[in-house]
């Protein structure tokens, strides 16, 4: 029985998600920075960093989490330059994450950092979106295996398409090794979201 259009689209969407590039990003991150940075209670790698910026991000967060809340200034930090009010924005402490974890402050340990996981997410998004962008530019076009039953919908590719797919994986590998990403994550953690440029490109190509 022929596959419905909906079933075909589901099969292709499952196939297209570039998990390989995201996995490459995770492996490169762990190879460069190690597993210790993912420990939420480990702040030594931040405070002992040769660059002062990561310490600024972390200390800004620690002061913000202990700062009183006076509506409507939910992002205000009253501890950083007491007695004056400043904002968590100015310490580059990843404000959205800082706001989220401030809400969870009652269950968090006394020392808590989320910058290691932020870095891992940046590397994975860099790899995944890089593969998605390159695959779209290269014209990777998998097709549904119509001989499969509905329960085992598959995807088939020509040798040329397979080569293009592996080329997109190689390209993703190069972009997760991008020196600017490594430098930003190491010295200016809040600026490591290079993947935002790739996301913009991907959305433009999709349109």
What are the residue ranges of the model-derived segments?
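Secondary-structure transition/capping motifs at alpha-helix termini
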Residues: 106-111, 135-140, 165
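Start-transfer (signal-anchor) and selected internal transmembrane alpha helices
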Residues: 1-40
């Amino acid at each position: 029985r022929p596959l419905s259009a909906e079933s075909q689209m589901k099969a292709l969407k499952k196939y297209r998600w570039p998990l390989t590039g995201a996995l490459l990003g995770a492996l490169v991150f762990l190879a460069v920075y190690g597993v210790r940075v993912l420990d939420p209670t480990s702040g030594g790698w931040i405070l002992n960093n040769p660059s002062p910026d990561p310490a600024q991000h972390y200390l800004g967060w620690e002061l913000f989490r202990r700062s009183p809340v006076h509506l409507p200034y939910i992002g205000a930090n009253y501890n950083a330059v007491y007695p004056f009010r400043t904002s968590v924005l100015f310490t580059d402490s990843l404000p959205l994450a800082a706001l989220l974890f401030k809400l969870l402050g009652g269950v968090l340990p006394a020392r808590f950092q989320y910058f290691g996981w932020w870095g891992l997410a940046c590397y994975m998004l860099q790899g995944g979106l890089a593969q998605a962008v390159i695959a779209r530019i290269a014209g990777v076009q998998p097709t549904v295996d119509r001989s499969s039953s509905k329960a085992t919908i598959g995807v088939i590719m020509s040798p040329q398409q397979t080569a293009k797919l592996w080329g997109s994986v190689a390209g993703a590998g190069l972009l997760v090794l991008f020196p600017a990403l490594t430098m930003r994550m190491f010295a200016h953690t809040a600026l490591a979201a290079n993947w935002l440029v790739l996301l913009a490109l991907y959305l433009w190509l999709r349109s």
